[in-house]
Amino acid sequence: MSRYTGPSWKQSRRLGLSLTGTGKELARRNYVPGQHGPNNRSKLSEYGLQLAEKQKLRFSYGLGEKQFRNLFVQATKAKEGTLGFNFMVLLERRLDNVVYRLGLATTRRQARQFVNHGHILVDGKRVDIPSYRVTPGQVISVREKSMKVPAILEAVEATLGRPAFVSFDAEKLEGSLTRLPERDEINPEINEALVVEFYNKML
Protein backbone atom coordinates (compact mmCIF):
# COMPACT_ATOMS: atom_id res chain seq x y z
CA MET A 1 0.00 0.00 0.00
CA SER A 2 1.44 3.35 -1.07
CA ARG A 3 1.71 6.39 1.16
CA TYR A 4 -1.47 8.46 1.30
CA THR A 5 -1.03 11.80 -0.47
CA GLY A 6 -4.64 12.98 -0.62
CA PRO A 7 -6.35 15.81 1.28
CA SER A 8 -5.23 15.69 4.90
CA TRP A 9 -8.43 17.35 6.16
CA LYS A 10 -10.68 14.59 4.80
CA GLN A 11 -8.35 11.89 6.08
CA SER A 12 -8.24 13.54 9.50
CA ARG A 13 -12.02 13.53 9.73
CA ARG A 14 -12.16 9.93 8.59
CA LEU A 15 -9.72 8.87 11.31
CA GLY A 16 -10.96 11.25 14.00
CA LEU A 17 -7.38 12.50 14.43
CA SER A 18 -5.76 15.75 13.36
CA LEU A 19 -3.01 14.99 10.83
CA THR A 20 -2.11 18.65 10.42
CA GLY A 21 -1.41 19.14 14.10
CA THR A 22 -3.74 22.14 14.29
CA GLY A 23 -7.03 20.40 15.04
CA LYS A 24 -8.85 22.85 12.75
CA GLU A 25 -10.21 20.13 10.48
CA LEU A 26 -11.95 18.42 13.41
CA ALA A 27 -13.16 21.62 15.02
CA ARG A 28 -14.98 22.53 11.84
CA ARG A 29 -16.53 19.13 11.08
CA ASN A 30 -15.95 16.36 13.59
CA TYR A 31 -17.51 13.62 11.48
CA VAL A 32 -16.37 11.45 8.58
CA PRO A 33 -16.47 12.98 5.08
CA GLY A 34 -19.22 12.11 2.63
CA GLN A 35 -22.94 12.59 2.16
CA HIS A 36 -23.87 10.53 5.23
CA GLY A 37 -20.93 11.63 7.37
CA PRO A 38 -22.83 13.09 10.35
CA ASN A 39 -24.93 9.93 10.69
CA ASN A 40 -22.20 7.39 9.96
CA ARG A 41 -21.49 6.22 13.52
CA SER A 42 -21.90 2.45 13.16
CA LYS A 43 -20.23 0.37 15.85
CA LEU A 44 -16.96 -1.23 14.77
CA SER A 45 -16.07 -4.88 15.28
CA GLU A 46 -13.01 -5.86 17.31
CA TYR A 47 -11.01 -6.15 14.08
CA GLY A 48 -12.43 -2.83 12.90
CA LEU A 49 -11.29 -1.11 16.09
CA GLN A 50 -7.79 -2.57 15.75
CA LEU A 51 -7.58 -1.59 12.08
CA ALA A 52 -8.83 1.93 12.79
CA GLU A 53 -6.24 2.44 15.54
CA LYS A 54 -3.47 1.12 13.31
CA GLN A 55 -4.53 3.48 10.54
CA LYS A 56 -4.65 6.44 12.94
CA LEU A 57 -1.07 5.79 14.03
CA ARG A 58 0.20 5.05 10.51
CA PHE A 59 -1.36 8.12 8.93
CA SER A 60 -0.25 10.39 11.77
CA TYR A 61 3.37 9.56 10.87
CA GLY A 62 2.62 9.53 7.13
CA LEU A 63 4.03 6.08 6.38
CA GLY A 64 3.08 3.48 3.79
CA GLU A 65 1.79 0.15 5.08
CA LYS A 66 4.92 -1.84 4.17
CA GLN A 67 7.28 0.61 5.85
CA PHE A 68 5.01 0.83 8.89
CA ARG A 69 4.76 -2.95 9.24
CA ASN A 70 8.50 -3.44 8.82
CA LEU A 71 9.13 -1.00 11.65
CA PHE A 72 6.72 -2.97 13.83
CA VAL A 73 8.67 -6.14 13.08
CA GLN A 74 11.87 -4.37 14.17
CA ALA A 75 10.16 -3.40 17.42
CA THR A 76 9.38 -7.06 18.16
CA LYS A 77 13.12 -7.73 18.40
CA ALA A 78 13.67 -5.36 21.34
CA LYS A 79 14.63 -7.21 24.52
CA GLU A 80 13.24 -4.65 26.97
CA GLY A 81 10.02 -2.68 27.31
CA THR A 82 6.55 -3.29 25.90
CA LEU A 83 6.13 -3.95 22.20
CA GLY A 84 3.63 -1.17 21.60
CA PHE A 85 5.73 1.50 23.27
CA ASN A 86 8.95 0.28 21.62
CA PHE A 87 7.19 0.59 18.27
CA MET A 88 6.12 4.15 19.00
CA VAL A 89 9.65 5.09 20.07
CA LEU A 90 10.99 3.83 16.73
CA LEU A 91 8.44 6.03 14.97
CA GLU A 92 9.55 8.99 17.07
CA ARG A 93 13.20 8.43 16.21
CA ARG A 94 12.66 8.84 12.47
CA LEU A 95 14.55 11.88 11.19
CA ASP A 96 11.49 13.45 9.59
CA ASN A 97 9.62 13.16 12.88
CA VAL A 98 12.48 14.69 14.89
CA VAL A 99 12.62 17.59 12.42
CA TYR A 100 8.89 18.05 13.03
CA ARG A 101 9.25 17.80 16.82
CA LEU A 102 12.00 20.44 16.75
CA GLY A 103 9.61 22.84 15.05
CA LEU A 104 11.58 23.07 11.80
CA ALA A 105 8.42 22.02 9.95
CA THR A 106 4.73 22.53 10.65
CA THR A 107 3.77 18.96 9.69
CA ARG A 108 5.53 15.62 9.34
CA ARG A 109 4.78 15.70 5.62
CA GLN A 110 6.59 19.01 5.30
CA ALA A 111 9.46 17.69 7.44
CA ARG A 112 9.80 14.73 5.09
CA GLN A 113 10.06 17.10 2.14
CA PHE A 114 12.76 19.16 3.86
CA VAL A 115 14.79 16.00 4.49
CA ASN A 116 14.28 14.73 0.93
CA HIS A 117 15.39 18.07 -0.49
CA GLY A 118 18.65 18.01 1.46
CA HIS A 119 17.91 20.89 3.84
CA ILE A 120 18.73 18.89 6.98
CA LEU A 121 22.08 17.91 8.52
CA VAL A 122 22.80 15.29 11.17
CA ASP A 123 26.01 15.97 13.06
CA GLY A 124 27.05 18.31 10.25
CA LYS A 125 26.45 15.83 7.42
CA ARG A 126 23.55 16.01 5.00
CA VAL A 127 21.06 13.18 5.40
CA ASP A 128 18.23 12.96 2.87
CA ILE A 129 16.62 9.76 4.17
CA PRO A 130 13.44 10.50 6.18
CA SER A 131 13.55 7.09 7.87
CA TYR A 132 17.07 7.67 9.24
CA ARG A 133 17.03 6.66 12.91
CA VAL A 134 18.15 9.47 15.19
CA THR A 135 20.17 8.66 18.31
CA PRO A 136 19.81 10.86 21.41
CA GLY A 137 22.54 13.49 21.40
CA GLN A 138 22.91 13.79 17.64
CA VAL A 139 22.68 17.39 16.42
CA ILE A 140 19.97 18.07 13.85
CA SER A 141 20.48 21.34 11.99
CA VAL A 142 19.56 23.23 8.85
CA ARG A 143 22.11 23.36 6.04
CA GLU A 144 23.67 26.82 5.77
CA LYS A 145 22.32 27.36 2.26
CA SER A 146 18.82 26.53 3.51
CA MET A 147 18.75 28.79 6.57
CA LYS A 148 16.69 31.43 4.79
CA VAL A 149 14.12 29.09 3.28
CA PRO A 150 10.84 30.89 4.12
CA ALA A 151 8.91 27.71 4.99
CA ILE A 152 11.52 26.71 7.59
CA LEU A 153 11.67 30.16 9.18
CA GLU A 154 7.87 30.36 9.26
CA ALA A 155 7.65 26.95 10.93
CA VAL A 156 10.13 27.95 13.65
CA GLU A 157 8.27 31.19 14.29
CA ALA A 158 4.90 29.41 14.43
CA THR A 159 6.04 26.75 16.91
CA LEU A 160 4.70 27.63 20.35
CA GLY A 161 6.17 24.74 22.31
CA ARG A 162 8.32 21.66 21.95
CA PRO A 163 8.33 18.29 23.72
CA ALA A 164 10.53 17.94 26.80
CA PHE A 165 12.63 15.28 25.10
CA VAL A 166 14.09 17.68 22.49
CA SER A 167 16.18 20.85 22.76
CA PHE A 168 16.33 23.60 20.15
CA ASP A 169 18.35 26.75 19.46
CA ALA A 170 16.23 29.04 17.28
CA GLU A 171 19.15 31.32 16.39
CA LYS A 172 21.32 28.47 15.14
CA LEU A 173 18.36 26.50 13.74
CA GLU A 174 19.63 23.35 15.37
CA GLY A 175 18.57 20.99 18.10
CA SER A 176 18.68 17.42 19.26
CA LEU A 177 16.74 14.52 20.64
CA THR A 178 18.05 14.78 24.19
CA ARG A 179 16.51 11.50 25.34
CA LEU A 180 13.94 8.93 24.32
CA PRO A 181 10.37 10.01 25.04
CA GLU A 182 8.19 8.67 27.83
CA ARG A 183 4.84 7.13 26.93
CA ASP A 184 2.79 10.03 28.27
CA GLU A 185 4.76 12.48 26.10
CA ILE A 186 3.68 11.08 22.73
CA ASN A 187 0.35 10.38 21.03
CA PRO A 188 -1.92 10.16 24.09
CA GLU A 189 -4.88 9.66 21.74
CA ILE A 190 -3.46 6.34 20.46
CA ASN A 191 -4.14 2.95 22.08
CA GLU A 192 -1.04 1.10 20.91
CA ALA A 193 -2.29 -2.17 22.41
CA LEU A 194 -4.89 -2.32 19.62
CA VAL A 195 -2.14 -1.88 17.03
CA VAL A 196 -0.16 -4.73 18.59
CA GLU A 197 -3.26 -6.95 18.57
CA PHE A 198 -3.83 -6.15 14.90
CA TYR A 199 -0.32 -7.12 13.80
CA ASN A 200 -0.13 -10.14 16.09
CA LYS A 201 -2.98 -11.58 14.03
CA MET A 202 -1.44 -10.56 10.71
CA LEU A 203 2.20 -11.59 11.19
UniProtKB/Swiss-Prot annotation:
GO terms for cellular component: small ribosomal subunit. Keywords: Ribonucleoprotein, Ribosomal protein, RNA-binding, rRNA-binding. The keyword Ribosomal protein applies. One of its GO terms (molecular function) is structural constituent of ribosome. It comes from the Bacteria. GO terms for biological process: ribosomal small subunit biogenesis; translation. Residues 93-156 form the S4 RNA-binding domain. Pfam families: Ribosomal_S4 (PF00163), S4 (PF01479). Part of the 30S ribosomal subunit. Contacts protein S5. The interaction surface between S4 and S5 is involved in control of translational fidelity. PANTHER family: 30S 40S RIBOSOMAL PROTEIN, SMALL RIBOSOMAL SUBUNIT PROTEIN US4M. One of the primary rRNA binding proteins, it binds directly to 16S rRNA where it nucleates assembly of the body of the 30S subunit. With S5 and S12 plays an important role in translational accuracy. Belongs to the universal ribosomal protein uS4 family. This is Small ribosomal subunit protein uS4.
